[in-house]
């Protein structure tokens, strides 16, 4: 007998939870109160931007729509290290150290983006 999971909302967290439940074999139902054009939670206001750490451009190739595009080889993607991400988060913490959850956010950020990409989340 499969488990039934109900997801309320259709933002990033909700859809990620739904995908994870599907991967575990659950039957998933998503309820969204908003009209389709207004759905997507706070993510709809980010223009798809999500912060994640990476050491170099090679780690980004699997995320690109067309990594063989000739412009890619001439692009310097730089890096956004975990240390830089942590420093940026500290700017929002009013002098408090990073929480356990923030540390997980940083350490799992690339892995999470890759996981979302593997499920065609755009």
Where are these regions (language model features)?
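Conserved N-terminal/central alpha/beta ligand/cofactor-binding core
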Residues: 33-122
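Beta1/beta-strand and adjacent pyrophosphate-binding region of the FAD-binding site
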Residues: 1-13, 29
């Amino acid at each position: 007998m499969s488990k039934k999971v109900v997801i309320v909302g259709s933002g990033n967290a909700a859809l990620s939870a739904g995908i994870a439940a599907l991967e575990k074999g659950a039957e998933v139902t998503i309820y969204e109160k908003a009209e389709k054009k207004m759905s997507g939670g706070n993510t709809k206001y980010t223009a798809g931007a999500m912060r994640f750490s990476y050491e170099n451009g090679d780690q980004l190739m699997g995320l690109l729509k067309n990594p063989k595009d000739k412009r890619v080889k001439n692009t310097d993607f730089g890096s956004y290290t975990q240390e830089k991400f942590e420093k940026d988060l500290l700017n929002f913490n009013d002098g408090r150290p990073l929480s356990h959850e923030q540390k997980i956010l940083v350490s799992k950020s690339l892995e999470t983006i890759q996981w979302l990409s593997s499920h065609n989340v755009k």
